[in-house]
Amino acid sequence: MKIGNRYISATTIAIPLYIISFVGFLMEKNIKDFWKIKILNKPIKVKYNVIKLVLLAMISIVLIGMLPSKASVMILTLNYLILISAKMILIQKNNIKTVLKLWGIALILGISFVICILVFTPYQVERIDAIFNPEKYAQDEGWLALNRKMIINSAQAFGEAEDMGNANVLLDEGDNYALVSVLAHYGWVISSAIVIAIILFSCKLILDAVKIKDEYGKLLIIGISTMFILESILNILMNFNLGIEADFSIPFISYGEMNMIVNLAILGFLLSIYKRKDIYMYECERENIASDCW
Protein backbone atom coordinates (compact mmCIF):
# COMPACT_ATOMS: atom_id res chain seq x y z
CA MET A 1 0.00 0.00 0.00
CA LYS A 2 1.32 3.46 -0.93
CA ILE A 3 0.81 6.56 1.21
CA GLY A 4 2.25 9.58 -0.58
CA ASN A 5 5.73 8.55 -1.67
CA ARG A 6 6.03 5.91 1.05
CA TYR A 7 5.12 2.26 0.92
CA ILE A 8 3.64 0.40 3.87
CA SER A 9 2.65 -3.23 4.25
CA ALA A 10 -1.12 -3.65 4.34
CA THR A 11 -0.81 -6.15 7.20
CA THR A 12 0.95 -3.55 9.37
CA ILE A 13 -2.29 -1.56 9.51
CA ALA A 14 -4.80 -4.39 9.04
CA ILE A 15 -3.75 -6.61 11.96
CA PRO A 16 -4.12 -4.02 14.77
CA LEU A 17 -7.43 -2.83 13.27
CA TYR A 18 -8.73 -6.40 13.11
CA ILE A 19 -7.69 -6.94 16.73
CA ILE A 20 -9.41 -3.76 17.94
CA SER A 21 -12.57 -4.68 16.00
CA PHE A 22 -12.54 -8.23 17.37
CA VAL A 23 -12.31 -6.94 20.94
CA GLY A 24 -15.33 -4.73 20.21
CA PHE A 25 -17.34 -7.77 19.11
CA LEU A 26 -16.19 -9.67 22.21
CA MET A 27 -17.64 -6.89 24.36
CA GLU A 28 -21.10 -7.00 22.78
CA LYS A 29 -24.03 -7.78 25.04
CA ASN A 30 -24.93 -11.42 25.39
CA ILE A 31 -27.68 -12.29 22.96
CA LYS A 32 -29.83 -15.12 24.26
CA ASP A 33 -30.72 -16.44 20.80
CA PHE A 34 -29.45 -19.93 20.03
CA TRP A 35 -29.01 -21.80 16.80
CA LYS A 36 -29.92 -25.45 17.11
CA ILE A 37 -27.80 -27.84 15.09
CA LYS A 38 -27.50 -31.61 15.04
CA ILE A 39 -24.18 -33.42 15.22
CA LEU A 40 -24.41 -37.23 15.06
CA ASN A 41 -28.17 -36.90 15.64
CA LYS A 42 -27.55 -35.05 18.88
CA PRO A 43 -29.14 -31.59 19.18
CA ILE A 44 -26.65 -28.93 20.20
CA LYS A 45 -27.37 -25.31 21.06
CA VAL A 46 -24.85 -22.76 19.84
CA LYS A 47 -25.04 -19.12 20.85
CA TYR A 48 -25.55 -16.62 18.06
CA ASN A 49 -22.64 -14.54 19.41
CA VAL A 50 -20.27 -17.50 19.19
CA ILE A 51 -21.20 -18.24 15.57
CA LYS A 52 -20.78 -14.57 14.65
CA LEU A 53 -17.34 -14.37 16.31
CA VAL A 54 -16.13 -17.52 14.56
CA LEU A 55 -17.33 -16.28 11.16
CA LEU A 56 -15.78 -12.83 11.61
CA ALA A 57 -12.49 -14.37 12.74
CA MET A 58 -12.42 -16.75 9.76
CA ILE A 59 -13.22 -13.97 7.27
CA SER A 60 -10.44 -11.72 8.57
CA ILE A 61 -7.93 -14.59 8.61
CA VAL A 62 -8.82 -15.56 5.04
CA LEU A 63 -8.49 -11.94 3.87
CA ILE A 64 -5.05 -11.66 5.50
CA GLY A 65 -4.05 -14.99 3.96
CA MET A 66 -4.95 -13.73 0.48
CA LEU A 67 -2.22 -11.07 0.60
CA PRO A 68 -0.45 -13.64 1.06
CA SER A 69 1.22 -13.52 4.47
CA LYS A 70 1.57 -16.72 6.47
CA ALA A 71 3.27 -14.79 9.28
CA SER A 72 0.27 -12.47 9.64
CA VAL A 73 -2.16 -15.40 9.52
CA MET A 74 -0.27 -17.13 12.33
CA ILE A 75 -0.09 -13.99 14.49
CA LEU A 76 -3.75 -13.07 13.95
CA THR A 77 -5.01 -16.61 14.64
CA LEU A 78 -3.01 -16.94 17.87
CA ASN A 79 -4.15 -13.45 18.88
CA TYR A 80 -7.82 -14.35 18.44
CA LEU A 81 -7.38 -17.53 20.48
CA ILE A 82 -5.66 -15.64 23.31
CA LEU A 83 -8.35 -12.93 23.30
CA ILE A 84 -11.18 -15.48 23.42
CA SER A 85 -9.40 -17.35 26.23
CA ALA A 86 -8.89 -14.13 28.20
CA LYS A 87 -12.55 -13.18 27.72
CA MET A 88 -13.76 -16.58 28.93
CA ILE A 89 -11.56 -16.42 32.04
CA LEU A 90 -12.68 -12.85 32.79
CA ILE A 91 -16.33 -13.92 32.56
CA GLN A 92 -15.86 -16.87 34.86
CA LYS A 93 -12.60 -18.19 36.28
CA ASN A 94 -13.80 -21.81 36.29
CA ASN A 95 -13.88 -21.66 32.48
CA ILE A 96 -10.26 -22.87 32.40
CA LYS A 97 -11.34 -26.38 31.34
CA THR A 98 -13.30 -24.89 28.45
CA VAL A 99 -10.27 -22.80 27.48
CA LEU A 100 -8.09 -25.93 27.45
CA LYS A 101 -10.64 -27.65 25.21
CA LEU A 102 -10.58 -24.63 22.89
CA TRP A 103 -6.78 -24.78 22.60
CA GLY A 104 -6.93 -28.55 22.14
CA ILE A 105 -9.32 -28.19 19.21
CA ALA A 106 -7.21 -25.36 17.76
CA LEU A 107 -4.05 -27.47 18.10
CA ILE A 108 -5.64 -30.45 16.33
CA LEU A 109 -6.93 -28.23 13.52
CA GLY A 110 -3.54 -26.49 13.24
CA ILE A 111 -1.61 -29.77 13.03
CA SER A 112 -4.10 -31.11 10.46
CA PHE A 113 -3.71 -27.94 8.39
CA VAL A 114 0.10 -28.16 8.47
CA ILE A 115 0.01 -31.84 7.47
CA CYS A 116 -2.27 -31.03 4.52
CA ILE A 117 0.10 -28.27 3.38
CA LEU A 118 3.12 -30.58 3.62
CA VAL A 119 1.31 -33.36 1.73
CA PHE A 120 0.04 -31.18 -1.12
CA THR A 121 3.11 -28.91 -1.34
CA PRO A 122 6.16 -31.15 -0.78
CA TYR A 123 8.61 -28.31 -1.44
CA GLN A 124 7.58 -26.84 1.93
CA VAL A 125 9.29 -29.81 3.61
CA GLU A 126 12.56 -28.79 1.97
CA ARG A 127 12.09 -25.19 3.13
CA ILE A 128 11.65 -26.34 6.73
CA ASP A 129 14.59 -28.75 6.50
CA ALA A 130 16.72 -25.95 5.02
CA ILE A 131 16.33 -23.93 8.23
CA PHE A 132 17.95 -26.62 10.39
CA ASN A 133 20.25 -28.14 7.73
CA PRO A 134 21.16 -25.18 5.52
CA GLU A 135 24.29 -26.85 4.13
CA LYS A 136 22.13 -29.28 2.13
CA TYR A 137 20.38 -26.41 0.35
CA ALA A 138 23.19 -23.86 0.19
CA GLN A 139 22.38 -22.80 -3.37
CA ASP A 140 18.64 -22.22 -2.93
CA GLU A 141 16.32 -22.44 0.11
CA GLY A 142 19.13 -22.71 2.65
CA TRP A 143 21.16 -19.71 1.47
CA LEU A 144 19.82 -17.23 4.04
CA ALA A 145 19.86 -19.74 6.89
CA LEU A 146 23.45 -20.75 6.03
CA ASN A 147 24.65 -17.15 6.13
CA ARG A 148 22.89 -16.58 9.44
CA LYS A 149 24.56 -19.72 10.81
CA MET A 150 27.98 -18.48 9.68
CA ILE A 151 27.42 -15.15 11.41
CA ILE A 152 26.14 -16.77 14.63
CA ASN A 153 29.07 -19.21 14.83
CA SER A 154 31.73 -16.52 14.26
CA ALA A 155 30.18 -13.58 16.14
CA GLN A 156 32.38 -11.76 18.68
CA ALA A 157 31.44 -10.17 21.99
CA PHE A 158 31.99 -6.76 20.37
CA GLY A 159 32.59 -5.72 16.80
CA GLU A 160 32.17 -7.53 13.52
CA ALA A 161 31.90 -11.30 13.19
CA GLU A 162 34.96 -13.14 11.89
CA ASP A 163 32.96 -14.65 9.05
CA MET A 164 30.58 -11.95 7.86
CA GLY A 165 29.20 -14.14 5.09
CA ASN A 166 26.70 -11.99 3.26
CA ALA A 167 25.70 -9.82 6.21
CA ASN A 168 25.22 -6.72 4.07
CA VAL A 169 23.05 -8.67 1.64
CA LEU A 170 21.04 -10.05 4.55
CA LEU A 171 20.35 -6.51 5.70
CA ASP A 172 19.22 -5.59 2.20
CA GLU A 173 16.90 -8.61 2.04
CA GLY A 174 14.45 -6.81 4.32
CA ASP A 175 13.84 -5.57 7.81
CA ASN A 176 13.19 -9.10 9.10
CA TYR A 177 16.93 -9.73 9.61
CA ALA A 178 17.79 -6.63 11.60
CA LEU A 179 18.76 -8.64 14.69
CA VAL A 180 21.25 -10.94 12.95
CA SER A 181 22.68 -7.91 11.13
CA VAL A 182 23.26 -6.20 14.50
CA LEU A 183 24.96 -9.40 15.68
CA ALA A 184 27.19 -9.43 12.59
CA HIS A 185 28.28 -5.79 12.92
CA TYR A 186 28.23 -5.10 16.68
CA GLY A 187 28.57 -8.46 18.45
CA TRP A 188 26.79 -10.55 21.06
CA VAL A 189 26.68 -7.91 23.80
CA ILE A 190 24.67 -5.41 21.76
CA SER A 191 22.36 -8.02 20.23
CA SER A 192 21.82 -9.64 23.66
CA ALA A 193 20.97 -6.22 25.10
CA ILE A 194 18.33 -5.82 22.38
CA VAL A 195 16.82 -9.23 23.18
CA ILE A 196 16.77 -8.40 26.91
CA ALA A 197 15.10 -5.06 26.16
CA ILE A 198 12.45 -6.89 24.11
CA ILE A 199 11.84 -9.33 27.00
CA LEU A 200 11.51 -6.47 29.51
CA PHE A 201 9.17 -4.59 27.15
CA SER A 202 7.03 -7.74 26.80
CA CYS A 203 6.91 -8.20 30.59
CA LYS A 204 5.87 -4.56 30.99
CA LEU A 205 3.02 -5.04 28.51
CA ILE A 206 1.80 -8.12 30.42
CA LEU A 207 1.93 -6.27 33.75
CA ASP A 208 0.00 -3.36 32.24
CA ALA A 209 -2.73 -5.74 31.09
CA VAL A 210 -3.03 -7.13 34.63
CA LYS A 211 -3.33 -3.64 36.15
CA ILE A 212 -6.17 -2.48 33.89
CA LYS A 213 -9.44 -2.73 35.82
CA ASP A 214 -11.82 -2.16 32.95
CA GLU A 215 -12.55 -5.27 30.89
CA TYR A 216 -12.61 -3.53 27.51
CA GLY A 217 -9.30 -1.79 28.17
CA LYS A 218 -7.79 -5.02 29.50
CA LEU A 219 -8.73 -6.95 26.34
CA LEU A 220 -7.38 -4.17 24.10
CA ILE A 221 -4.06 -4.21 25.98
CA ILE A 222 -3.94 -8.03 25.78
CA GLY A 223 -4.66 -8.02 22.03
CA ILE A 224 -2.11 -5.38 21.01
CA SER A 225 0.50 -6.66 23.48
CA THR A 226 0.10 -10.19 22.14
CA MET A 227 0.71 -8.89 18.63
CA PHE A 228 3.97 -7.17 19.67
CA ILE A 229 5.15 -10.15 21.74
CA LEU A 230 4.40 -12.78 19.08
CA GLU A 231 6.11 -10.74 16.35
CA SER A 232 9.20 -10.30 18.54
CA ILE A 233 9.46 -13.95 19.64
CA LEU A 234 8.94 -15.39 16.16
CA ASN A 235 11.42 -12.94 14.61
CA ILE A 236 14.11 -13.75 17.18
CA LEU A 237 13.62 -17.49 16.62
CA MET A 238 13.80 -16.98 12.84
CA ASN A 239 16.98 -14.88 13.08
CA PHE A 240 18.73 -17.59 15.09
CA ASN A 241 17.55 -20.43 12.79
CA LEU A 242 15.17 -21.79 15.43
CA GLY A 243 11.90 -20.96 13.69
CA ILE A 244 10.23 -20.98 10.30
CA GLU A 245 11.19 -18.51 7.58
CA ALA A 246 8.39 -15.95 7.28
CA ASP A 247 7.70 -12.23 7.20
CA PHE A 248 8.21 -11.59 10.93
CA SER A 249 9.56 -8.22 12.04
CA ILE A 250 10.54 -6.88 15.45
CA PRO A 251 8.50 -3.81 16.44
CA PHE A 252 10.68 -0.68 16.87
CA ILE A 253 13.84 -2.60 15.87
CA SER A 254 13.25 -3.59 12.25
CA TYR A 255 13.80 -0.60 10.00
CA GLY A 256 11.09 1.02 7.90
CA GLU A 257 9.82 4.57 8.40
CA MET A 258 6.10 3.93 7.92
CA ASN A 259 6.12 0.72 9.97
CA MET A 260 7.82 2.60 12.79
CA ILE A 261 5.19 5.36 12.65
CA VAL A 262 2.37 2.80 12.83
CA ASN A 263 4.02 1.00 15.76
CA LEU A 264 4.50 4.29 17.62
CA ALA A 265 0.84 5.17 17.02
CA ILE A 266 -0.21 1.79 18.44
CA LEU A 267 2.08 2.29 21.45
CA GLY A 268 0.49 5.70 22.04
CA PHE A 269 -2.91 3.99 21.90
CA LEU A 270 -1.77 1.53 24.59
CA LEU A 271 -0.46 4.32 26.81
CA SER A 272 -3.76 6.21 26.51
CA ILE A 273 -5.55 3.11 27.81
CA TYR A 274 -3.02 2.51 30.59
CA LYS A 275 -3.26 6.01 32.03
CA ARG A 276 -6.97 5.33 32.63
CA LYS A 277 -6.26 2.01 34.34
CA ASP A 278 -8.13 3.00 37.52
CA ILE A 279 -11.18 4.46 35.75
CA TYR A 280 -14.47 2.75 34.95
CA MET A 281 -16.40 4.40 32.16
CA TYR A 282 -19.68 2.93 33.37
CA GLU A 283 -20.89 1.07 36.44
CA CYS A 284 -20.85 -2.62 35.60
CA GLU A 285 -22.62 -5.53 37.16
CA ARG A 286 -20.06 -8.31 37.55
CA GLU A 287 -22.08 -11.49 37.68
CA ASN A 288 -21.80 -14.59 35.51
CA ILE A 289 -21.91 -12.56 32.29
CA ALA A 290 -19.36 -10.32 30.68
CA SER A 291 -19.15 -6.67 31.52
CA ASP A 292 -20.71 -4.39 28.90
CA CYS A 293 -18.68 -1.34 29.82
CA TRP A 294 -15.61 0.44 28.63
What do the predicted segments below correspond to?
Residues 1-26, 37-50, 65-72, 136-138, ...:
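Membrane-interface segments at transmembrane-helix junctions in multi-pass inner-membrane proteins
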Residues 22-32, 81-94, 200-212, 270-278:
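Structural signal for the C-terminal ends of transmembrane alpha-helices
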Residues 49-66, 70-119:
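Hydrophobic alpha-helical segments of polytopic membrane proteins
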